[in-house]
Structures are given as structure tokens and as C-alpha cells.
Amino acid sequence: MTRGEMKYEGKAKRVYATENPHEYVVEYKDDATAFNAQKRGEWAGKGATNNAITAHLYPQLEAAGIPTHFLEKLSDREQRVKAVTIVPVEVIVRNVAAGSFSKRLGVEEGTPLPRPVVEYCYKSDALGDPLINTDTAVALGWASEDDLKRIRELALQIRDFLVPYFEKRGVRLIDFKLEFGKLPSGEIVLADEISPDTCRFWDAETNEKMDKDRFRRDLGGEAEAYAEMLKRVTREV
């Protein structure tokens, strides 16, 4: 597959056109950002680790009946995906209070939530990905009511797959962010990635953080935590 012009560069990935107008190549970078890119860093192997984790999980989600943009892993840093139009509404699914949820609502971090909480943010680096509701998304034309209904349905299906998957590997899935895209047919599919960049992972025994919070909160050991998550994700149980 020939990698063509760069279509988009985000904080953690680059997206390239290919000779097939219906497919892209996604390249994972080693860059790390936090607080809407106000804090920046990088470490060797980060992109390859996130690519490997995503490339391991997405086919399993597909097998569970959840449509994704993923086609195949091409190299350590690259994967081939279906070309989608990203819905500019990020979805956060929370199982345990943490991060901005705890700060915003005064709920102690680590408090289990009696049911999953689904939140929506407008995908805009310039505005800091502000929290929105579904009425706002529909009124401003970012997504239709049917799109949002399907997105919520898929997000909860993904949650129901991932929680026991990680539990079997000694990891608590605290919360996670998802992005969805639309195929030319109008079908909604999971896009982006599932990795320590987009999820909060805590060790099930110690509650040690094994995700980007290690960078975000200056805890150190980011590379080691990401490498450990790759080992656990790919562990046969």
C-alpha cells in the first residue's frame, strides 16, 4: 500500500491518503500531550505500543459485533483503516469517578459508579473539548439524534466487552474516551484508538495507574506502564 499526502495530523497520530480513496494509513507518533496540549513530551516506543494495543483489540471488538474502521496492522507504527468522516463528538464512558469528573462534581476519585456514565465533548482542541449534551450536538449539526443514539449504544457495548476483558488481565477500566466515524454508507463505526492514551487503567490489586495519568500527573514510569499494558492486553487467559 502506498502512503500518499497527509490528510490530518493530531496530537498523537497522522492520517495519510492511499491509492484507494476508501482507505487511509494511520501513523502513531511518540508525542505525548495533556491538558489540551498545554503539556507536551514524548518517549520512544509510545506510538508503537498504542498501535499494537489498538490492533489487538479492534479485531476482537469486530468479532463481538462492534463495527470499527480497523483493517490491518501494517508496521510497528502504522495501520490500514477505512476512510471515515469523524463525528466531532467525543464520548467518555465512566465506570469509576476519576479525573475531571471527580473535580467537577466533588466525587472522591476511585468511587465506583453504580451504573456507567456516558458524557459527550465537542472535539475541538481550540476550545478545550468542552462538555456538551446531545441537544447541543444536534442543534449545531455535529450529529443527528439517530447518530447519537447509535453512538451511545455502541459505546456501552464496547464497555461491556472491555470491562471483563481487562478484569481477566488484572486491570480495572476506570474510564475511556471513544471517537466514531461515518462510512460513505452512513454506518457509524468505532474509529481512533483504544490505548493508555485514551483509557484510565488501574492495576486491580494495587490501583497503580497504568495510563497517561503517569505523564499528566508527573508520576514517571510512563514507558514502563504502557509496556506492561501491552503485555496484559495481549496475554491469553
From Swiss-Prot:
Example GO molecular function = ATP binding
**Catalysed reaction, written as an equation:** 5-amino-1-(5-phospho-D-ribosyl)imidazole-4-carboxylate + L-aspartate + ATP = (2S)-2-[5-amino-1-(5-phospho-beta-D-ribosyl)imidazole-4-carboxamido]succinate + ADP + phosphate + 2 H(+)
> A Pfam family matched by this chain, by name?
SAICAR_synt
- Kindly tell me the pathway this chain contributes to: Purine metabolism; IMP biosynthesis via de novo pathway; 5-amino-1-(5-phospho-D-ribosyl)imidazole-4-carboxamide from 5-amino-1-(5-phospho-D-ribosyl)imidazole-4-carboxylate: step 1/2
EC number of the protein:
6.3.2.6
Q: Could you tell me the keywords of this UniProt record?
A: ATP-binding, Ligase, Nucleotide-binding, Purine biosynthesis
Q: List the SUPFAM superfamilies.
A: SAICAR synthase-like
Question: What biological-process terms (Gene Ontology) are attached?
Answer: 'de novo' IMP biosynthetic process; cobalamin biosynthetic process
Q: Which family does it belong to?
A: Belongs to the SAICAR synthetase family.
HAMAP family attached to this UniProt entry: SAICAR_synth (MF_00137)
Name of the protein in its database record: Phosphoribosylaminoimidazole-succinocarboxamide synthase
Identify the species of origin. Deinococcus radiodurans (strain ATCC 13939 / DSM 20539 / JCM 16871 / CCUG 27074 / LMG 4051 / NBRC 15346 / NCIMB 9279 / VKM B-1422 / R1)
